[in-house]
Amino acid sequence: MSKNEIKLQMEYASSYETWLEAAEKLDVIEGKYQWREQKESDEYDYVLVESRLHELRRHRLSKNTRLLLGLLRNSVARDFANMDNSRLYNYAHSGTKKLIDEFIQEVLMCLTYLEETPDLSLDEKITEFSRLKLTTGNTALILSGGGTFGMTHIGVLQSLHEQGLVPKIICGSSAGAIVACAAAVRNKEEQEILLRQFHTGDLSVFTDPNAAPPSVIQSVKQYFTRGCVLDISHLERVMKLLIGDFTFQEAYDRSGYILNVTVSCGSLFEMPSLLNYITAPNVLVWSAVVATCSVPFLFKRATLWERDPLTREVSAFCVTDAPLWMDGSVDNDIPHAKLTELFHVNHFIVSQVNFHIVPFIMDPTSHNWVERCCKKAIDLAAQEVSLTFRLFAELGIFSVLFTKLQSVITQKYSGDITIIPRLNYREVNKVIKNPTPSFLLDAATRGKRGTWTKVPVTRNHCAIEILIAAAYTRLIKRSKSLK
């Protein structure tokens, strides 16, 4: 089979297993599989990894629990021996160095041994796994905005769900919040059903599905009479049906997922808000999604609604004198700092489908010098435009508009792992149209295929964290059952 035929197999694979099999074949043909089998590389400390691997294995097999525990405390961090170096995952298609994969598997076996060993008391295990949780930190999955292209996130979530790699912290902005919230208010079993049947649901968020789309003249008239092009009531109706009547606190209690939604304020001096069960426990999730999807000029700014946990009375959520909110992507598409502050997040998986952003995202660690030069040029151009917008804002020329535009340009739109599904730019005209079932199926497929290329790095970066968190939860439950 030729290289081009294998690439086509990868491009049109129907499952991750099929894609991985083709990726390994391509690595063999290109000589990259041999690179994976060779432990040597300047990109990480392979000597330290190999020696630590042998030490961990020796202590686990000989059941030297105390010595093993001491070693693990210094071995579970993602950046141990520089193993999180993105260059290690940019060369071969099917994964990184086999030594790194072997090390991760050994750490997982050691953690399982610690959870099950009779050498430690239950309280000791809880204490040690709590410390290990702090050492590894937390991963957050962030789903960007992108209009109907945001439905590509369905496939991203499907792939991560199938591999058992969905983080407990999920954040969404604008269209990404629709998928994030629909998933995070449900438990794992319900999530699986939702993701499988998402394309059959009602997502008529822009216009009445039973009426003809408004003409250009009607849209212009609507804008000048109401200040927006589309009626927000359709978005509200669909979100209530899709998400239900849960508050952020209720969603967390129900599913265990820490759901976050970013919203922007329309004024000049208000900071963007990150809504979750800590900052806005009683806010209704559907209203947060409506607010973050309220694209300026397209929809009117929205009101956040909260429900009193005692009286069940619903009222406007107002933490400022300006209770109207809009598209979270304007100020904070990827809220790195706030998530780090609130939830000890030190690792970000970003699914980026903003069609106006994706062409400009380039890997700074790329081996391709042309890509590196292009990225430098784009960064310099963005800085110049940003300074111009800032100057206009400081001179009082449309201050709010130019401040928001500057925010859009200067934001960071990528993460430690950035998933960029292939977008169909021929369908840009559908970005603010009600998505059809066929469009949703195609978007989900693109999302899945875009995620498969990142499964090896995601698994190696997150497997230890996920096992530690699961073991800690089991130990806590066991402790409570004994009381």
Curated annotation (Swiss-Prot):
Record keyword Cytoplasm present: yes
Among the Pfam families in the record, one is DUF3336
Mind telling me which InterPro entries this protein's record contains? Acyl_Trfase/lysoPLipase (IPR016035), NTE (IPR050301), PNPLA_dom (IPR002641), Triacylglycerol_lipase_N (IPR021771)
PNPLA domain location: 141-340
Record keywords, A-Z: Cytoplasm, Hydrolase, Lipid degradation, Lipid droplet, Lipid metabolism
Which parts of the sequence form the motif GXSXG? 172-176
Q: Where is this motif: GXGXXG?
A: 145-150
- Cellular localisation: Cytoplasm; Lipid droplet
Q: Name one GO cellular component term.
A: lipid droplet
* EC number(s) stated in the UniProt entry for this protein: 3.1.1.3
Q: What is its main location?
A: cytoplasm
Which catalytic reaction applies to this protein? a triacylglycerol + H2O = a diacylglycerol + a fatty acid + H(+)
Q: Please give the function described in this protein's UniProt entry.
A: Lipid particle-localized triacylglycerol (TAG) lipase. The lipid droplet/particle is a lipid storage compartment which serves as a depot of energy and building blocks for membrane lipid biosynthesis. Involved in the mobilization of the non-polar storage lipids triacylglycerols (TAGs) from lipid particles by hydrolysis of TAGs, releasing and supplying specific fatty acids to the appropriate metabolic pathways.
- List the PANTHER family: NEUROPATHY TARGET ESTERASE/SWISS CHEESE D.MELANOGASTER (PTHR14226), TRIACYLGLYCEROL LIPASE 4-RELATED (PTHR14226:SF10)
Q: Would you tell me the protein name for this molecule? A: Triacylglycerol lipase ptl3
Give the originating organism. Answer: Schizosaccharomyces pombe (strain 972 / ATCC 24843) (Fission yeast)
Give me the gene this protein comes from. Answer: ptl3
